[in-house]
Amino acid sequence: MPPRKPPTVYDVATRAGVSIATVSRVLRSPQKVTESTRERVLAAIDELGYVPNASARGLAGRRTGVLGLLIPGHDAPPIAPPGSAEEHAVEFIDDMDRSFVDPERNHYFEQLVRGCEISAWSSGYALLVASGPDLSRSVVLDDLEGRVDGIIVISRTVPDDLIARSAQRVPLVVVAGRAAGTADSVRVDNAGGMAAVTRHVLARKPSGPVLYLGGPADSPDGVEREEGFRREVDGSGESWRIASTDFTTEGGAREMRRALAEIRPGAVIAANDQSALGALTALSEAGIGVPDDCVVTGFDGIEDARWSQPALTTVRQPMTDVGVQAVQTLLRRMADADAPGQDLQLPVDVLLRESCGPLGR
């Protein structure tokens, strides 16, 4: 029986009932296609198992020498037409406006990418970093399958069912969350790290309730960190409450201001550093001294936490090491596709700084 012919863009167009040009627009510029049409095309791609990169299909059966890393991205800003005044305009931003947040500045991913690059290069591989807006990441993942020998995916970047599907077709490792299906995973001890810093806070905090600034409900890291927090405060006799943030500095400041309208906390434990930095800003605005009136901690170990006023006590994630181990785990999977799945958990450190008071207190 002859081998099954790989599906083509023509097959996708026929299945979806659209033109080839429309399929191309969905793959390259999904925001330019109506939602209903986009869903039909993506459904056809999924049903047929179509890999958009036609040239990459010719590489089947031999190595490319490239590893892929898929990370969350942002919608591209509008591009001014050539020769327009906006092309050379200098923008003035009120940097005292606390609502301004640079979405491109994400220290978490900077360290992770660096670790992946170091490990890939030292192992003789190039690293292809891919990203895209929410609507196109599943297509980007499909495209990566045809371009690389293996893929590293940040948890939540694409739905778990798509990760599980890709793991059946190409070696794949999930970072910052448990893997779906047969994929391997590399993550840190979120619950243990948060439990440790919470114990430290409970032993040193001024009087007042504990406010926990958690993360999004769909964040695996956020869920595990909240578990570690609850493990320590349950039964501690302390009064505590939880507020959810979007893991941004702005979100941390916003939730801190809302909480201050109702309570005067003796401690703020944040699920990430950026939320904690926002909380420091809101506390300062309210005239609440840190650490004398309220202690504050974060989680991640980003460089900005070292230079905040006061310097932020935090749980340091070894994100560079996570990147290194993700690549090494991927290479092991590439060498032995039938090996048992691996869930590697790396330890974290608590960095004690001024936001929790003198170290000897």
Could you say what each language-model-derived stretch is?
Residues 27-30, 74, 134, 158, ...:
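Short, glycine/serine-rich, charged loops/turns that create anion-binding
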Residues 19, 65, 149, 207-209, ...:
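Short acidic/polar active-site loop segments enriched in Thr and Asp
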Residues 28, 60, 131, 135, ...:
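Positions that flank functional sites
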Residues 1-3, 46-47, 69, 113-123, ...:
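Bacterial carbohydrate/catabolite-sensing allosteric modules
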Residues 1-66, 70, 360-361:
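N-terminal helix-turn-helix DNA-binding module of bacterial transcription factors
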Residues 6, 52-53, 136-138, 160, ...:
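Structural motif corresponding to alpha-helix initiation and N-cap regions
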Residues 54, 131-133, 155, 244, ...:
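Short loop/edge segments at beta-strand edges and connector loops
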Residues 1-3, 66, 74-199, 259:
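Alpha-helical recognition/docking segments in bacterial nutrient-uptake
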